[in-house]
Amino acid sequence: MNVYLVGGAVRNRLLKLPVTERDWVVVGATPEEMLLLGYKKVGKNFPVFLHPETKEEYALARTERKMAEGHTGFACYASPDVTLEEDLLRRDLTINAIACNDKGDLIDPYQGEKDLNQLILRHVSEAFIEDPLRVLRVARFAAQFAHLGFSIDSVTLDLMTKISQSGELLTLSPERVWKETEKALLSPSPHIYFQVLKHCSAILVLFPEIDTLCSPLRCPLSHGLSTLSIAAKLTDQKEVRFAALCHILGKKLTEYDVLGTHDRAVLKRVPLCDLNKIEQLCERLKLPNLFRELLKHTLKYRGLVTIINRLSFPLLLNFFDELDLWRKPYRLEQLILISKADESTEGGVEGKHDYQAQYVREAFNIARAVSVKKILEGGFRKEAIQKELTRRRNQALDQWQKQKT
């Protein structure tokens, strides 16, 4: 029985990157032997065990054979006679198919270390094409390591395109697609993930709402990717990054229930959005509410941030109400970040955005400072409370504006 460290831990160690988790492969053992040693079995489809002390995963060496469509359509064979080289052969990329023994020696039958040194993401074997999830995984690794200079081997990219055209991507569950996407959003270069998916025709299958925006003459996706790239430098919040990409969806003028001719004139200049496409995206991928809410707010209100100082105070307060900023003030900063990334992409004047951002922050703090307690002490009840609160907030904003001028 021999135990080897494999996968991401070996790869990251060679790249001098942090190792967050360690996976092990066991050669020459049976499930019964693992149980006798105190390991706990956790794998359903193949023998994976948890170490009794470290709780790290130890998998018996295995081979896989394609039996049906999809990521789970494999028959696994795990036996003491399966070699380490056979186990490594089933892995996706050469850089993930390197093992290390207890002496620190590398076992690298597929030249993964060479590809690491040459900054190449390359498939291990032709069996790569059998698992559709690998399209997402390779795109994610491209996003994870783009800042180091990694690129995808051209033959590997061709295989990814074949998978995309085969229809097998449709067999992936929404949860699995989103899991890989969410990981990619946390990478240093999340825009590369979607760029790769576009290049290998996977975005048409997995994110059709985004892909359909592209035409031979114009592709708003490029703007979305640029906005995402800038947003990734401004924040590590994955929901903000995703909203920065998706703010390009469904451009359409949307009417507001505005309160005056001044507001109507201002809002005519703000292209807002149809929420149908974002609803489709959210439902199909089963996005968490945190993402859904920010996406909808971004599509509806991001444009207002760029002209926020031109809105009347009644409309500004309505904006605060609809975002529920009184209970969730962080939403304002999220919209400001997305707007900043978008304006930077379009070559906007940074000072202008900073002015609008500071204006809306100050206005919100002024409005939020109005005391509800004093209104209650004044004898107001039921509907009169909200009416009086709005009146006092308008009054406070008027006084603030007079002081500024």
UniProtKB/Swiss-Prot annotation:
Binding positions for Mg(2+) per the UniProt entry: 21, 23
Residues involved in ATP binding: 8, 11, 91, 137, 140
Keywords of the record: ATP-binding, Magnesium, Metal-binding, Nucleotide-binding, Nucleotidyltransferase, RNA repair, RNA-binding, Transferase, tRNA processing
Enzyme class: transferase
Record has Heme as a keyword: no
Cofactor(s), by name: Mg(2+)
GO molecular-function terms, A-Z: ATP binding; CCA tRNA nucleotidyltransferase activity; magnesium ion binding; tRNA binding
Binding residue positions for CTP: 8, 11, 91, 137, 140
Catalytic activity: a tRNA precursor + 2 CTP + ATP = a tRNA with a 3' CCA end + 3 diphosphate; a tRNA with a 3' CCA end + 2 CTP + ATP = a tRNA with a 3' CCACCA end + 3 diphosphate
Known EC number: 2.7.7.72
Stretches assigned to the HD domain: 220-326
Gene3D superfamilies: Beta Polymerase, domain 2, cca-adding enzyme, domain 2
PROSITE patterns, alphabetized: HD
Record-level GO BP terms: RNA repair; tRNA 3'-terminal CCA addition
Domain of life: Bacteria
Keyword Iron: no
Note: A single active site specifically recognizes both ATP and CTP and is responsible for their addition.
Family indicated by similarity: Belongs to the tRNA nucleotidyltransferase/poly(A) polymerase family. Bacterial CCA-adding enzyme type 2 subfamily.
Task performed by this protein: Catalyzes the addition and repair of the essential 3'-terminal CCA sequence in tRNAs without using a nucleic acid template. Adds these three nucleotides in the order of C, C, and A to the tRNA nucleotide-73, using CTP and ATP as substrates and producing inorganic pyrophosphate. tRNA 3'-terminal CCA addition is required both for tRNA processing and repair. Also involved in tRNA surveillance by mediating tandem CCA addition to generate a CCACCA at the 3' terminus of unstable tRNAs. While stable tRNAs receive only 3'-terminal CCA, unstable tRNAs are marked with CCACCA and rapidly degraded.
Protein name, per record: CCA-adding enzyme
Gene assigned in the entry: cca
